[in-house]
């Protein structure tokens, strides 16, 4: 038997190579050595599956006279069958941080190819895996602590930020915001802290360092933005320090507290910063949500040197400052791969925007015309806004570069472009003057639900579609995603269902769910009850509704449920897998099975006679 085939079966069945060689496995039912085996029929394989408890024993070490096969119902030999791919499926499902997993009984079907007369036995199993996200943490924090909103945002950052950036890594999947919240619910929202156990999560020291720095950069940026419209801080901070000013900036502002100002502005800025990164496709220049208001400077600028303006100097040296920060970290840089065109595209993305570009539309003044005052640093409103925007652009690029050092497979997969679409919706709502507190809360809640959905579907796609061995040997009969919104009493508020039978089911489901959520989020402030047929038809058209995707009434129920009412969201992933049944050609194993079967039937008959 070929070594390559043994290695493939080892990964699919979990059995040792020595056991597989001893087993002499084949999946061809026309093989003369197994043509008349009792398990070659559906009735026979079902009996063997029940008697030897295949759902459990197929996950164990079945080597001859091993710890498992020495005990009944075995007689020292492996069972006559191995379920090719079953072990792989169970291992992949168990490796993900689901809260609950349910596996159905294994069913068997005999398949016959009429054209070639090939026969094979196929196993099938339905898995249902789920976890919960505590979306109510947002509304509990924001709605109940409006008097201390600055402190509340700090709590949200501490409770959510690390959970947020872990989804960018995708090495170890995240269970959801609920995991962070549940650990500290007994102490209340004010007790939120972040102490991620990276070794337990199987995150390397390198990635742990990157994740912590991404966290610090985002905290520094949200604090800087919330302080920007305000007078300088009591302790004056000289900027831009030196060519390595980014390190001092992150160190200073990550330890500061957000300014307590308008709640909608604060939460909106927080939501925007949270979407920053390579997967969001968002540049720092897009962060000016309130045109013309971010004009203050929470620090003192140093005077121009050699008649060179500070902002223009920072813009020219932005890339150098970003790289200097990353080079200062105790990590080995990832070697970039890709075509020449991809490298050129990345370089163009990292190029600082020219003056006047971006939503702010503020043109940078000429260097010789930029003026400063001794105390504040910049005298003109446009100059201060331009400087602020350059700081945001620089930190935004730094976040993007840090995330580039993480797992590149997530960016290439296409499973994380929802951030860009959701952020685009946020800007659209702002332009339409619809960015109310309720809308922001709904957007933020839906964003995190989408993030966990994307992370899970990305993982499943990598395991069962992108993996060549799994794709060739494991069938994907259908995939279904079920979302249940619950109140704080556990009452079910709405249930959403998405279903697909294609081989690329996970990617198809992802695209449909993102489009669905965009439409639901955009309509969150609507007052219509969707009673008129034309209103329902328009709603379904906007969502690109597909049959077998749940009741239309449930869609409307989700729309009419306020974010504060949804305390938690349960995400369930139901997948039906299939694979071939392997048969042993070893006559020793075959004779052992016949003896075991005859003994079992004899015991059953004696029990019937008593």
Curated annotation (Swiss-Prot):
InterPro entries noted in UniProt: Adeno_preterminal (IPR003391)
Modifications after synthesis and translation: Preterminal protein is used to replicate viral genome, upon genomic encapsidation it is processed first into iTP and finally into TP by adenovirus protease.
Disulfide cysteine pairs (residue numbers): none
Motif (Nuclear localization signal): 328-337
Residues where O-(5'-phospho-DNA)-serine is found: 549
Key words of the record: Covalent protein-DNA linkage, DNA replication, DNA-binding, Host nucleus, Phosphoprotein, Viral DNA replication
Localization (cell): Host nucleus matrix
Annotated spans, Disordered: 288-379
Pfam families tied to this protein: Adeno_terminal
Positions in coiled-coil regions: none
Annotated site residues (Cleavage) in this chain: 177-178, 285-286
GO MF entry, a single one: double-stranded DNA binding
Gene Ontology biological process terms from the UniProt entry: DNA replication; viral DNA strand displacement replication
Function (record text): Protein covalently bound to the viral DNA that acts as a primer for viral genomic replication by DNA strand displacement. Assembles on the viral origin of replication in an initiation complex with viral polymerase, DBP, host NFIA and host POU2F1/OCT1. The terminal protein stimulates the template activity over 20 fold compared to protein-free templates. Neo-synthesized viral genomes are linked to two preterminal proteins, one for each 5' end.
Subunit relationships: Heterodimer with the polymerase; this heterodimer binds to bp 9 to 18 of the genome. Interacts with host POU2F1; POU2F1 binds to the auxiliary sequences in the inverted terminal repeats and tethers the pTP-POL heterodimer to the origin DNA thereby participating in the assembly of the pre-initiation complex (POL-TP-DBP-NFIA-POU2F1).
Recorded family membership: Belongs to the adenoviridae terminal protein family.
Name of protein: Preterminal protein
Gene, per the UniProt record: PTP
